[in-house]
Amino acid sequence: MSKTIIEFKNVSKTYADTDTTVLKDISFELEEGKFYTLLGASGSGKSTILNIIAGLLDATDGDVILDDKRINDLPANKRNVHTIFQSYALFPNMNVFDNVAFALKIKGVDKKEIAKRVSESLKLVRLDGFEKRSITKLSGGQKQRVAIARAIIDRPKVLLLDESLSALDMKLRKDMQYELRELQQSLGITFIFVTHDQEEALAMSDWVFIMNEGEIVQSGTPTDIYDEPINHFVADFIGESNILNGKMIEDYLVEFNGQKFEAVDGGMRKNEPIEVVIRPEDIWFTLPNEGKFNVKVDTQLFRGVHYEIVAYDEFNNEWIIHSTHKAIVGETVGLDFDPEAIHIMRLNESEEEFDARIEEYVEEEETVGLAKAVEEENAEEEAAIQEAVKEALENTMELTELAETVNEILQKQENETENSESGDHK
């Protein structure tokens, strides 16, 4: 089990002069050597958490633990934590070497050791040979790398990154996402990244915290959060979503848009009001009346890798569809999707209740899945026997030959059963 490097225990932050609470009873544990992202809009509290960890802000209530020690009263310069700000905070009057070496010089580290470690750090960020380059002569991406090299030169326990990619252009920002992730994995230190950009969070993180109005709304892996948003806010915040009101008729059967649809969610009350989420990329077009229902195409935009198409159904619900096929504005088409594309959100469900429900029906699904696999295997064997009978009738196969074929199939089934039981006993 990985070691916990940072822990928040019921941490709150209130500004007394305005009586404004920006963090509300925050608790979490972060494991050593992972990439975490605090994701939220401006004012959600994500940068406040970062500044409390760094020692730039004091928590009003609660405990902040770093490497098994309470650090609420520990000065910022005594914490083995480094921060990279959005502005990078580089010294324009110093060259690259002096910027990267700054912290080691302050600590009085030997000159030979400084030179060695500066060289190692610059190599890690792919800037070897830039030691004498002026900061003013660097591109935005190069400045970003210098800031990272300076932050990692004395191997902090935790690296904090506050919106540190937001000043870069789109292509460079995507390149830096790969580089940051690779760097974190090669160094093995904990990264805590703050952003409002959903794509950055999903691309780089081991674990994401979604924040809103000073609270953690949902936390989980990028895949979990994207595929199973806990509520309307998360579903809408993480990528494009089609969100509709509906009713859970029973486990695995949901009603919305005046129709009943097979789903994969369970663990709810019968006829419970819910919200349905279907991602735009999980929908495809059909001919009219051949899909789940019809829609009329209203607008479309070309996004480079796909068309983003907006359409409306007979109830005037808006549907966003991502398709590689161009639509015709004004035409009526059918929409279709798989049961797995329908994600169910309960109203006012806490994260603890949500996690428990997901775990419960996932376990049930695994059990049902095993039984279904056995059933399908038996059906395949029965189909094979029927096919052999059919072939015998069509080709006047001798009865003895037919019997041998059937016996071979049955013997194979018996052997597989014995092998399976033998494996279970081991």
Swiss-Prot record:
Concerning SMART domains, the annotation shows: AAA
Give the binding site residues for ATP: 40-47
Main localization is membrane
Provide this UniProt record's keywords sorted from A to Z. Answer: ATP-binding, Cell membrane, Membrane, Nucleotide-binding, Translocase, Transport
Mind telling me which InterPro entries this protein's record contains? Answer: AAA+_ATPase, ABC_SmlMolc_Importer, ABC_transporter-like_ATP-bd, ABC_transporter-like_CS, Mo/tungstate-bd_C_term_dom, P-loop_NTPase, Transp-assoc_OB_typ2
**What EC number(s) does its UniProt record assign?**
7.6.2.11
Q: Fetch the Gene3D superfamilies from UniProt.
A: 2.40.50.100, P-loop containing nucleotide triphosphate hydrolases (3.40.50.300)
The EC category is: translocase
The record's annotation in Pfam families points to: ABC_tran, TOBE_2
Does the record bear Secreted in its keywords?
A: no
Query: Catalyzes what?
Result: ATP + H2O + polyamine-[polyamine-binding protein]Side 1 = ADP + phosphate + polyamineSide 2 + [polyamine-binding protein]Side 1
Cellular component annotations (GO), alphabetically ordered: ATP-binding cassette (ABC) transporter complex
What range does the record give for the signal peptide? none
Which ranges carry the ABC transporter domain? Answer: 6-238
Q: Give GO terms: molecular function aspect only.
A: ABC-type polyamine transporter activity; ATP binding; ATP hydrolysis activity
* Membrane-topology annotation of the record: Peripheral membrane protein
Which branch of life, at top level? Bacteria
Compartments in which it is found: Cell membrane
Q: Which family does it belong to?
A: Belongs to the ABC transporter superfamily. Spermidine/putrescine importer (TC 3.A.1.11.1) family.
Write down the PANTHER family for this protein, in alphabetical order: SPERMIDINE/PUTRESCINE IMPORT ATP-BINDING PROTEIN POTA, SPERMIDINE_PUTRESCINE IMPORT ATP-BINDING PROTEIN POTA
Q: What is the stated purpose of this protein? A: Part of the ABC transporter complex PotABCD involved in spermidine/putrescine import. Responsible for energy coupling to the transport system.
Give the multimer and partner information: The complex is composed of two ATP-binding proteins (PotA), two transmembrane proteins (PotB and PotC) and a solute-binding protein (PotD).
Q: What is the protein name for this chain?
A: Spermidine/putrescine import ATP-binding protein PotA
Q: Where is the organism placed in the taxonomic lineage, from the top?
A: Bacteria, Bacillati, Bacillota, Bacilli, Lactobacillales
What gene codes for this chain?
A: potA
